[in-house]
Amino acid sequence: MHLLLLHGFTSHPVLTLGPLPERLKEAGWEVRQPALPGHGTRPEDLLKVRFQDWLLAAEEAYLELPEPRGVVGLSMGGLLAAHLAARHPTKALVALAPAFALKNPLAPYLHWLIPRFPGPPSIEDPELRKRNPNYPYFPTRAVLELLALMHKTPEVLPRVKARALVVEAGKDRVVKGVDRYFALLGSPRKDYLVFPESGHDLLLDRDREAVARAVRDWLLASDNYLQ
């Protein structure tokens, strides 16, 4: 199986996925980690991007992979992963803390108040938080594109038929509704895991190795089941 790994909004395209890519490679899978438009450069570049650009970039990267294919997405990447799995043959979908909805009720209005906002508290461990590789701030108008993608996602979730794993961060202070994402998935076989001590960035926080192993083991089991 060939795996596409999708990062989140404001996330570093590679480092935000922590140990996961290496664990997947060790298991024998080919992985690809594209940088979504506006990421891996500077925060202001997000102002040039619409949510359709993220969808298109993810789809292009996905279709370049040989079949059979699977997709793993973190946060916003979990939304993009669902869109891909709804449109194309997919062996497995993994959504890590998918950004079904934002916890901050002011998020839709921030662009009226301030031009930029600090990165959210996504890592609980204070020492690991100091090494957060993601954008330290983001333009508030860019959040509108994330919200637009969130608005489009519930309608595609029932069309997902791939085997699915959804992982919730027990101390997530960024997103909510992970259980709703799971409930709406049309996958006939789907599993749900919770890491109670982890913040939103599951692969950068204190349980990062355990999360990476859990995803690897679930994918191994899925690979064997589907052969």
Regions inferred by a protein language model and the residue ranges of each:
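Gly/Ala-rich beta-loop-alpha elbow adjacent to hydrolase catalytic centers
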Residues: G73-A81
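Catalytic histidine neighborhood in serine/cysteine hydrolases
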Residues: F182-D201
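Catalytic active-site module of serine/aspartate enzymes centered on a nucleophile-bearing elbow/loop
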Residues: E197-Q227
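Short beta-strand/loop motif that positions the catalytic acidic residue
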Residues: R159-V160, V166-E168, D172
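Short, surface-exposed "cap/lid" segments of acyl-processing enzymes
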Residues: M1-R42
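Conserved alpha/beta-hydrolase "acid-adjacent" motif
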Residues: R173-D179
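Active-site nucleophile loop of the alpha/beta-hydrolase fold
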Residues: V94-K103
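Active-site nucleophile elbow and catalytic-triad environment of alpha/beta-hydrolase enzymes
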Residues: P139-V156
